UniProtKB/Swiss-Prot annotation:
Is required not only for elongation of protein synthesis but also for the initiation of all mRNA translation through initiator tRNA(fMet) aminoacylation. The keyword Aminoacyl-tRNA synthetase applies. GO terms for molecular function: ATP binding; metal ion binding; methionine-tRNA ligase activity; tRNA binding. A motif ('HIGH' region) lies at residues 12-22. The gene is metG. It comes from Borreliella afzelii (strain PKo) (Borrelia afzelii). Homodimer. A motif ('KMSKS' region) lies at residues 330-334. Keywords: Aminoacyl-tRNA synthetase, ATP-binding, Cytoplasm, Ligase, Metal-binding, Nucleotide-binding, Protein biosynthesis, RNA-binding, tRNA-binding, Zinc. Binds 1 zinc ion per subunit. This is Methionine--tRNA ligase.
Amino acid sequence: MKKMNLITAALPYVNNIPHLGNLVQVLSADAFARYSKMSGIETLYICGTDEYGTATETKALIEKTTPLELCNKYYEIHKSIYKWFNIEFDIFGRTTNKHHQETVQNFFLKLEKNGYIKERETEQFFCNKDLIFLADRYVIGECPECQSMAKGDQCDNCSKLLNPTDLINPKCIICKNKPILKKTNHLYIDLPKIKTKLEKWIKNPTTSKNWNTNALKMTNAFLRDGLKERAITRDLKWGIPVPKKGYENKVFYVWFDAPIGYISITKNIVKNWESWWKNNKQVNLVQFIGKDNILFHTIMFPCIKIGSKENWTTLNQLSSSEYLNYENLKFSKSEGTGIFGNDVITTGIPSDVWRFYIYYNRPEKSDFQFIWQDLMERVNTELIDNFSNLVNRVLTFQKKFFGDVIETIEIQHKFWEQITPKYNKILNLFKNTELKSALKEILKISSFGNKIFQDNEPWKRKESSPQEIKELILNLIYLIRDLSILMMPFIPETSKKIQQFFGNSYQFSTKILGTKSGIKKIEFVEILFNKLEQKKINDLRLKYSGEKNMKEKEQPENLFREKVLLRVVKINKIERNPEAKNLFILKLDDGTNKDKQIVSSLEGYYTEEELLGKHIIIVDNLKPAKFRGIKSEGMLIAAEDKNKNFKIIIVEDSIKNPIAGERIILENDQNKDLTCPPKIDINKFSKANIITENGELKINGINLILEHSKNKILSKDIPNGIVC
């Protein structure tokens, strides 16, 4: 029975401009789809923009537009970038298409009918200032796993799936106030009830044998931890309405509706869509995703399909990639670091060069750092000195010394015996979505061709052994034709150009690999690529390095903003370290209902009675340390003058009724979306250069204040000094 390849790339959020790392999945799926088509397999490559949910609604608020207008804008931006990269989607749609709402609601109604939906009264964060329930991504705070800034559904840094209540020091993303928990009703999909069927499906040898090792490990680990009911509704306006009485003001959570978008996008364009999505016998479903999307494709979406009790096409091949990072920096438009899709277009570097480099370094098993110098070196050596050089030198030699016409070839069997087996290896690598390995094997063949040319010295032997050299060149010409086919999934425009040299209509079929006929003439030859110059690379690196902002970043106030987290805590209990009586062990309330303690050498400065019940300020993101065997989870801050007088900053000097857990910020950072800095050592804190000036804590002349009450932080006892 004929096999069909149904290929998807993870639907990108439509609230931003894709950067180089975001392009890995759509490019990977594009290469596989091109391979599939030239192998004679009926193929459908689907992608589209993921347009509903909190991220879109939030971005629309920031840009002061409607969610739909925002989606329209970014859809066109995404589409133009993908077009420039020569990504040949069969369908590039949107989840705001006319079929999406109906398709999502039908899935829900079937799940409800089959007993997989539960109604729960839950506590959800509510913002008293904005008077709204906060969806998961409207809540930000510190990830309990890695201490990075995270949103309430998932940590982007460590990929841990979260609930908003898991976050440390949660805040409303809109107003930055601390939300309260309030009762609300939501609908949940009963994943535990589907678990047995899901595990049976995953353990089936035909299911997961073609999944990445990392994807399988992550999925099995998630199953071992036990599936939990997961909410599928949210208190939002921008989303798919819930077709259930009492839920008229709620929408489906984006994780529930987005993967169904693969189906609805197909349905919107293809009349016989069921032949693709309800055809397990013939269709091979191949999905390309980033590692942060693994569980949504191996657990969540399969559970939705299983729970509907319909014969949906199920996942066969899963190709998950790691992260592509940028020069040890974070991609950030605002900071000018990293290169984004629209930037790539303006570099003057052809799209095939970018495609080549991304495939050459595709992060299949580990993260990869994009480095400008490496781009130049890989492109100049592998793409140009190896591949492009072979094409140019062989075709130019033929045209110059033997003419345009290609005679009947005398097959050099030893030559092809070394090459033909490699074709099968490369095609198998393509089939198994090992794209980086496939490309590197192709380049080995190109390198072999260059070696054969060099070793035979045709420029010397064309007179003494003309027939032998002519046969060598003709065999190399057919090798180049084959290389143009194998390279087509990676550098399609260049492959077409090579075949234009032969004057033929394009011949991109794996069936003609190794054949020695079909080329009649060399019409013309020209250089495929120009080498990347060091000056150009240096200029581009500088342009996208964010170095123009480095001086600003090094200012103490910016170091404080990015690296230091100060928080108000209340001293609930004080103990002495039995091993060192000068060390006070302070038991603290930081507003999270979790015990926290710090160790400080306070003997001779304070008694326990003077400090008990007081509110002080600690460096809350200091790396934990041990003092005489006792763990310390932060450091209190104090002021010291030139005479070495030392006094702790007591918050009661600044405000009558301090609140434990409140953050200390710069006065000019009011109402800003502040990040939660990572763990730091004491040196990072020292570089912030906090001082007391006329009784007020300042950095570079800017006052430190309480985030919510806005009161200035005062130092009554040490009006002028340093903070340590």
